[in-house]
UniProtKB/Swiss-Prot annotation:
<protein>
    <recommendedName>
        <fullName>Ribosome-binding factor A</fullName>
    </recommendedName>
</protein>
<comment type="subunit">
    <text>Monomer. Binds 30S ribosomal subunits, but not 50S ribosomal subunits or 70S ribosomes.</text>
</comment>
<dbReference type="InterPro" id="IPR023799">
    <property type="entry name" value="RbfA_dom_sf"/>
</dbReference>
<comment type="similarity">
    <text>Belongs to the RbfA family.</text>
</comment>
<dbReference type="GO" id="GO:0005829">
    <property type="term" value="C:cytosol"/>
</dbReference>
<keyword id="KW-0690">Ribosome biogenesis</keyword>
<dbReference type="GO" id="GO:0043024">
    <property type="term" value="F:ribosomal small subunit binding"/>
</dbReference>
<keyword id="KW-0963">Cytoplasm</keyword>
<dbReference type="InterPro" id="IPR000238">
    <property type="entry name" value="RbfA"/>
</dbReference>
<dbReference type="InterPro" id="IPR015946">
    <property type="entry name" value="KH_dom-like_a/b"/>
</dbReference>
<comment type="function">
    <text>One of several proteins that assist in the late maturation steps of the functional core of the 30S ribosomal subunit. Associates with free 30S ribosomal subunits (but not with 30S subunits that are part of 70S ribosomes or polysomes). Required for efficient processing of 16S rRNA. May interact with the 5'-terminal helix region of 16S rRNA.</text>
</comment>
<dbReference type="GO" id="GO:0030490">
    <property type="term" value="P:maturation of SSU-rRNA"/>
</dbReference>
<dbReference type="Pfam" id="PF02033">
    <property type="entry name" value="RBFA"/>
</dbReference>
<dbReference type="InterPro" id="IPR020053">
    <property type="entry name" value="Ribosome-bd_factorA_CS"/>
</dbReference>
Length: 132
């Protein structure tokens, strides 16, 4: 199957699962409406899909939410089968995704760095060496 079709199907799955979470149709109390589906990677034969989940909640609550989604995967898969026009609805695997939180932490670390050199001093020394 073409990569474009797989990416489009992954995006449709992401949107549908997000809608199920936001609408509260998943009754598991571990599944918070603050969970977000970052991306979905569908296998080439459409048999499997990896669903990457993150949240701004603490790591423990996010992992509990992922377990809740795993327990509700049958319901989610049935809902997807009704909405998507595919012969076989992929088997869903939910994965805790730390990449967004790690990215935010990295940006915060970079912003907290203090530079000991003054940019004006660097320009002044560069200009004097060019004049020689």
């Amino acid at each position: 199957m073409s990569e474009f079709r797989l990416a489009r199907l992954g995006e449709q799955i992401r949107e549908e699962i997000s809608a199920l979470i936001c609408s509260g149709k998943i009754k598991d109390p571990r599944v918070s409406s603050l969970l977000s589906i970052n991306r979905v990677i569908v296998s080439g034969d459409l048999a499997y899909a990896k669903v990457y989940v993150s949240s701004f909640l603490d790591e423990h609550k996010t992992k509990q939410g992922v377990r809740g989604l795993e327990n509700a995967s049958g319901f989610i898969r049935t809902s997807l089968a009704k909405k998507l026009h595919v012969r076989q609805c992929p088997e869903l695997t939910f994965i805790f995704d730390k990449s967004i939180k790690e990215g935010i932490d990295m940006v915060n670390k970079l912003e907290s760095l203090e530079y000991f050199t003054d940019p004006d001093e660097d320009e002044g020394t560069a200009g004097s060496s060019e004049a020689d």
